[in-house]
Amino acid sequence: MTDETNLSGFGSKAVHSGTNHIGDAVNTPIFQSSTYKLTDERYAGWAAGAQHTLLYARLSSVNSDAVAAKLCAMEGGEDAETFSSGMGAISTTLVSLLSNGDHIVASTDVYGGTYGLMTEELPRFGISTTMADMRDPASYEAAIQENTKILYIET
């Protein structure tokens, strides 16, 4: 890995952080592995709750870990998750934050997949959504209920 303590500029962080110099490659090579050897060390890390243990590519990979490290360096974050699609990111975030009985206020012009998630899928789990006009803050305020957990706006 690059010594990220010496990277000060945004561009330098974008290029150099999260880089895994395997085989003297300047940038992290693209790995097409879907599974990784389950060593005792990796298993122990996974069992202890390590978030970025290399076990299976859908959970973590050398490449997704490199992207996450770059995002953290550029944004000053502690950790990051990467997803293969926007809907993967949206649905994972909403499902992890909401429970049966919770409510969302969302903008009327969300992406069609988001609309379907909020109006067809989440109600099956007892999560309701009220649509509001994002151009009118008063409509958001009027839609807030006692059980509202998320105000959702897409741009």
Model-identified regions with their sequence ranges:
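Well-ordered alpha/beta subsegment
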Residues: 76-77, 103, 137, 141
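N-terminal "arm"/small-domain region of PLP-dependent enzymes with the aminotransferase-like
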Residues: 2-61, 69
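Short helix-loop-beta connector
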Residues: 74-78, 98-101, 146-147
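Buried hydrophobic positions in well-ordered alpha/beta secondary-structure cores of metabolic enzymes
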Residues: 24, 71, 89, 104, ...
